[in-house]
């Protein structure tokens, strides 16, 4: 680690103060849900487009190393979408249970 990469202490404290002031803001559950959903939707769309572009490129499909990378990306995408689906289903089930009681 070089000396140039060490951050001055007052810069870190200034960032911590900024973080604390943001934590006191009141955010509704609906807003948090919308922010999480929109961020997830954008990330998923970008990942899907990246995978589609890789599959449509003939140079990447014929190279075994690139094909393995594409397969790994598809696997990661599949796992992520499955996880989001499961968490959404569980969340909806929990809310329905709370509303019934």
UniProtKB/Swiss-Prot annotation:
It comes from the Bacteria. Keywords: Protein transport, Transport, Virulence. Coiled coil: none annotated. One of its GO terms (biological process) is protein transport. InterPro entries: T3SS_SctI-like. To S.flexneri MxiI. Required for invasion of epithelial cells. This is Protein PrgJ.
